[in-house]
Amino acid sequence: MAEKRNIFLVGPMGAGKSTIGRQLAQQLNMEFYDSDQEIEKRTGADVGWVFDLEGEEGFRDREEKVINELTEKQGIVLATGGGSVKSRETRNRLSARGVVVYLETTIEKQLARTQRDKKRPLLHVETPPREVLEALANERNPLYEEIADVTIRTDDQSAKVVANQIIHMLESN
């Protein structure tokens, strides 16, 4: 991979976007960004608080602006928020400005990986988490698939193994 293309990770919460993104960036000697962490840096508050204060629409507007700005950089790995693909603008920008890798996982893995995480505003509601994750999957999985250049299942694999798979796929394309 002579020229450093941007690599954008999409997928549901708990798929491993941030963990795998950091590993991938380290292995490729690229800068790593996480759209949720960027929002937290800029607001000085965690995403759950921003979500509560501004509502989902306000949060998504903020997320769209952050992703637009980050995707204009060159040679980065970006872990996007699970719901960022709801924005057509964001989907178009991700597709046009880099290689989109869809990290796929099962609902069971999502539940296991997110059960103790307090930074998941969509899971802190009255509805049981499984039902929330199933509804989100029905809504978002087609959007991830629509823009994915590469799809990789992350269940039962370490971040390093998945990062190596991504690198191999990028080198063979």
Swiss-Prot record:
Binding sites annotated in the UniProt record for substrate: D36, R60, G82, R140
Quaternary data: Monomer.
NCBIfam families (UniProt xref): PRK05057.1
Recorded family membership: Belongs to the shikimate kinase family.
Name of the protein described by the UniProt record: Shikimate kinase 1
Molecular function, one GO term: ATP binding
Listed CDD domains: SK
InterPro entries according to UniProt: P-loop_NTPase, Shikimate/glucono_kinase, Shikimate_kinase/TSH1, Shikimate_kinase_CS
Induction: Constitutively expressed.
Residues that coordinate or bind ATP: G14, A15, G16, K17, S18, T19, R120, Q157
Cofactor: Mg(2+)
Positions bound to Mg(2+): S18
Region (Lid domain) location: 116-127
Domain notes: The LID domain closes over the active site upon ATP binding.
Organism: Escherichia coli (strain K12)
Cellular component GO terms held in the UniProt record: cytosol
A Pfam family: SKI
Note in the entry: Two isozymes have been found in E.coli. AroK has 100-fold lower affinity for shikimate than AroL, suggesting that AroL is the dominant enzyme in the biosynthesis of the aromatic amino acids, with AroK playing a secondary role and possibly participating in an as yet unidentified cellular process.
EC number: 2.7.1.71
Keyword presence, Amino-acid biosynthesis: yes
Compartmental location: Cytoplasm
Broad EC category: transferase
One of the GO biological process terms: amino acid biosynthetic process
Keyword Kinase: yes
